Design a protein with these regions (language model features):
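Short, flexible loop/hinge motifs at secondary-structure junctions
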Residues: 1-229, 302
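Catalytic center-proximal scaffold of phosphoryl-transfer enzymes
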Residues: 2-8, 14-24, 53, 60, ...
Length: 546
């Protein structure tokens, strides 16, 4: 449009110039020169127009390219943002994987068996041994002064007596047959051993019949309870089969083989299975009494662990004291299973546990957290660069030492000033921890992804009194080791004999295991109480003294 307007103005100017020249200039020479100048001017104008058109095209091309570059930049910015987000996710995933790979039995709740074979040697000067959670006691290894110990002691009346005669005279080599015996110089030694043959003892029960001399009625005696068949195994064999399978975790077939090798009794696996089922059915009253006793205890340790039951993940729950143990099996881990077990809903004492959240729903109970779990988690946090964790570990261990010293001195609680100092130091460590984790305190109430160390910090902050319950109440243990040791048998059972095929089978197993564990804690021999159970008279637990 501009070029056409310019060409129009140029032609108009040329016409006017021509008119002016025609009117004003009559010289042919001047007219020719003027025409030449006008042609040159026209050529310059054309060249200019051509340059303008070229530059206009270049500008349009550059504008299109700029638009394309803008689109490319926008796409690249979006791609960069996506890559940065993916990088952040990958970095978080790598950190989480490193954290998982760094967990072992020392800095988490993983069992020692999960550590694998890649363990550093105990004495390796090239590698610094990792810090142990235990502190030196200052005592020498072995038995301590005043410890009674345990050893074989001679008996007054041995079962057998074997005399060893000298072959000949040690002085001259003469025959000593019929020579005088000198008892003053004799020495005797006793050997405790199994009998050469462990055979079954067959007892024949006869129901004697008597005829009354007065009326002529024939009366028969009654067989003992449990003697029902013409030929059967007795309660001792029943007890041995149940003991081997339930307490020693031996599979049914291997238990059968062991009984045969020891006694010669060729029992079947079906018989042992039936004996375990019979034992569980006979413990209904025992289980209810055990539950009631646990509900009345001042302090009970609780724990739970996963197990393979009926081809899926199930859960074994335990409630333990120094004298009582109760196991229950359930498909769930949380409050549904705890309600079904029946102890926590009626328990008003101190519940010691690992801090699993469903325990907190039982508000009528007093709660205490396991310091052993805290020490392991603090060690993991320290390995992740959280220096406050080391200070908290030292504080917990020092507090436990003070409690043990106070117990040894016959005290029932720490002095008020020591408790005040303990809580002040505790809060100081928590404050240091928040300084090393900025922004955590402000967002503590929000549901967001946090590291294990941050979750531990929030738990220690929000549940301070539960974490330090052991310092206020000397009945409360420092750790939940009692429950962890009791429930460890679940892992042993799975390693040795495998999982439970049915839900009912797991429940029966746990009931019999509760019976054996409680009996052992109260000084009873498992074989004896199992034989008593097989005879139809279940042993009943006694409440804790005091």
């Amino acid at each position: 449009m501009l070029a056409e307007a310019e060409r129009g103005s140029r032609s108009g100017a040329a016409n006017l110039a021509g008119v002016a020249i025609a009117g004003c200039v009559s010289s042919p020479r001047l007219s020719a020169e003027l025409e030449v100048l006008l042609d040159e001017r026209d050529a310059l104008i054309a060249e200019r127009d051509e340059l303008i058109e070229g530059q206009t095209a270049q500008i349009a091309a550059m504008e299109r390219r700029l638009a394309e570059l803008g689109d490319e930049i926008e796409v690249r910015d979006h791609t960069i943002a996506q890559l940065e987000a993916q990088l952040g996710q990958l970095q978080a995933a790598v950190a989480e994987l490193r954290q998982r790979l760094g967990k072992n039995s020392r800095n988490s709740s993983k069992p020692p068996s999960s550590d694998g074979l890649a363990k550093p040697p105990a004495n390796n000067s090239k590698k610094k041994n990792k810090r142990s959670l235990r502190r030196r006691s200052g005592r020498k290894p072995g038995g301590q002064p005043g410890h009674e110990g345990a050893r074989l002691e001679r008996v007054e009346v041995p079962d057998d007596h074997v005399e060893h005669e000298p072959d000949c005279c040690e002085g001259c080599g003469g025959d000593l047959q019929g020579a005088e015996r000198v008892e003053e110089g004799e020495e005797s030694r006793q050997v405790f051993d199994l009998p050469e043959e462990i055979a079954l003892r067959v007892i024949e029960h006869v129901a004697v019949c008597r005829c009354c001399e007065d009326c002529g009625t024939v009366s028969a005696g009654s067989f003992p309870e449990g003697v029902r068949a013409p030929v059967q195994y007795g309660p001792g064999v029943h007890a041995l089969g149940v003991y081997l399978h339930v307490f020693q975790h031996i599979p049914y077939d291997r238990a059968r083989q062991l009984i045969f090798d020891l006694t010669g009794a060729d029992v079947s696996t079906a018989s042992i299975t039936a004996w375990v089922d019979q034992a569980a059915r006979g413990l209904t009253e025992f289980d209810e009494q055990l539950r009631q006793l646990l509900c009345k205890e001042p302090v009970v340790n609780f724990d739970e662990t996963g197990a393979r039951i009926a081809g899926r993940l199930g859960w074994i729950h335990s409630a333990s004291t120094d004298t009582l143990t109760r196991y229950t099996a359930h498909a769930k881990r949380g409050t549904e299973a705890m309600d079904n077990a029946g102890v926590l809903p009626d328990f008003e004492g101190v519940a010691v546990h690992d801090g699993y959240k469903p325990y907190q729903s039982y508000e009528q109970a007093i709660h205490a957290l396991c310091s052993g779990h805290h020490l392991r988690e603090l060690l993991a946090a320290e390995e992740q660069g959280q220096s406050w964790a080391s200070a908290m570990s030292c504080l917990l261990l020092d507090s436990n030492e003070q409690v043990e010293q106070a117990k040894a001195a016959g005290l029932e609680a720490l002095a008020a000033d020591l408790l005040a100092e303990l809580h002040a130091c505790y809060r100081a460590v928590i404050a240091l921890a928040y300084e090393q984790n900025p922004g955590l305190a402000a967002n503590a109430h929000k549901r967001m992804k946090r590291t294990d160390a941050q979750n531990l910090l929030l738990r220690l902050d929000q549940r301070e009194h539960e974490a330090l319950r052991f310092a206020h109440d000397f009945r409360v243990p420092f750790t939940n080791n009692l429950a962890e040791q009791d429930i460890r048998m679940v892992k042993l059972q799975q390693k040795i004999s495998g999982s439970w095929r049915t839900d009912e089978g797991a429940k029966r197993y746990m009931r019999v295991r509760s019976y054996i564990s409680t009996a052992r804690k109260q000084g009873q021999r498992p074989i004896d109480v199992l034989a008593q159970l097989a005879s139809g008279r279940a042993w009943m637990p006694a409440p804790a003294p005091g």
